[in-house]
Amino acid sequence: MTRLTLALDVMGGDFGPSVTVPAALQALNSNSQLTLLLVGNPDAITPLLAKADFEQRSRLQIIPAQSVIASDARPSQAIRASRGSSMRMTLELVKEGRAQACVSAGNTGALMGLAKLLLKPLEGIERPALVTVLPHQQKGKTVVLDLGANVDCDSTMLVQFAIMGSVLAEEVVEIPNPRVALLNIGEEEVKGLDSIRDASAVLKTIPSINYIGYLEANELLTGKTDVLVCDGFTGNVTLKTMEGVVRMFLSLLKSQGEGKKRSWWLLLLKRWLQKSLTRRFSHLNPDQYNGACLLGLRGTVIKSHGAANQRAFAVAIEQAVQAVQRQVPQRIAARLESVYPAGFELLDGGKSGTLR
């Protein structure tokens, strides 16, 4: 594997450097070819590097930043006042070619806006989408987008998301001829918003997309599709609901039920079941799939969950490594060119799309 350099916004997220810096060291331990640029306040970063050995320090560089974009800041205001912030400087390192990708757990709206401003969308893409790869009950994986970058999406954007998701499924998840579905309130053709029905009509006309129709939310983890496309509002609510249910389920498995008198054999049986079920469903733990790629840009940007712990942020770093190694932006650009050889034209005020 060739050497690669990532830029980390270590000040972002709910816990800042106390999580991101140890996660960076963990990532260095796992990948001997990795170099990390830690962007943030040196006074907050340096003490957390006390346990780093000489070899790790040789692959670390602190890039001082003057400020941090607050997680509750309005994106428009945050972008206007972003110069010198850890988030903006992290993206600028990618733009300048000093880093091949970046990772941030900061303000999602600000990250989306700054990434679009600095790195620019690929030709043929209106707006980037947040995408993640979720495990399903068949022990496979499903690519899901958009997860919150775009609250409102017209049919053109949904079609573009489908193309990008299909490329990601093939190139990163290594699923040949991935099945693509639109998230909807029913499987019938007449169900759903106009934007969803119009996107469905366009997807049926694209030979390179293995479009299978609509999928309902209760089938998200069944493995019935390899790529699931939706608008950012729906995707964000769906993902967080699923994560909450999974965390509650795993928490219940670990509960010991203190204060309840039970026979020794019932306690033994319970502990055996806890260990067995925890192992069986551990792949659904949200920490293991943290890191949503901001897909559709000319560079690689990974958005970590703001509440990520050390393990989860390290997973987000690994997501960035994989995206760089698989050359995801370049492959999406190539697919768009093959699907839309003469460009993409919006019709009906953006309510539908067609090839020309």
UniProtKB/Swiss-Prot annotation:
Q: What is its EC number?
A: 2.3.1.274
Q: Enumerate the UniProt keywords alphabetically.
A: Cytoplasm, Lipid biosynthesis, Lipid metabolism, Phospholipid biosynthesis, Phospholipid metabolism, Transferase
Cross-referenced InterPro entries, in alphabetical order? FA_synthesis (IPR003664), Phospholipid_synth_PlsX-like (IPR012281)
Which GO BP terms, alphabetically?
A: fatty acid biosynthetic process; phospholipid biosynthetic process
Q: Name one GO molecular function term.
A: phosphate:acyl-[acyl carrier protein] acyltransferase activity
Give the pathway listed in the UniProt entry for this protein: Lipid metabolism; phospholipid metabolism
Record's GO cellular component terms? cytoplasm
Q: Which reaction does it catalyse?
A: a fatty acyl-[ACP] + phosphate = an acyl phosphate + holo-[ACP]
Where mainly found?
cytoplasm
Cell location? Cytoplasm
As for family, the record states: Belongs to the PlsX family.
Subunit composition and interactions = Homodimer. Probably interacts with PlsY.
Q: What does this protein do?
A: Catalyzes the reversible formation of acyl-phosphate (acyl-PO(4)) from acyl-[acyl-carrier-protein] (acyl-ACP). This enzyme utilizes acyl-ACP as fatty acyl donor, but not acyl-CoA.
How is this protein named in the record?
A: Phosphate acyltransferase
- Phylogenetic classification of the source organism: Bacteria, Pseudomonadati, Pseudomonadota, Gammaproteobacteria, Enterobacterales
GN (gene name): plsX
